Amino acid sequence: MRALLDTSVLIGAESPGTLEGAISAASLAELHFGVLVVLDPDERARRTQRLGVIEATFDPLPIDAAVAREWGRLAAAIADRGGQPRRRAMDLAIAATANVAGVPLVTHDEADFRLIEDLVQLRTP
């Protein structure tokens, strides 16, 4: 594994089944939520199909004790820097997963990680 893919990359990819890298279980949670809250039936069908491809392609990295510890460290850093970590809970779980795995986080949303950009290795796709 060379990188962890953020949810934004999974959503933005034309063919998510061709992406290379790993994903966090937190990304699957975000994708499942996205399927369940959309009201338009056509969009729900598109999201469900994309989620199926992603689940068939990737074996997500878990949020285990090591990731929980790293999440705490990153959340504390955000709080110390004047941010609100609870608003970014899923992003922090994904960043913590990347840090524990020792790989960069590939994201379209670098601004989401601005307060901890010195603590997480970020890349754009």
Annotated model-derived regions:
Residues 100-112:
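C-terminal structural segments of small proteins and small subunits
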Residues 2-3, 13-100, 114-124:
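PIN-domain endoribonuclease scaffold, especially VapC-family toxins
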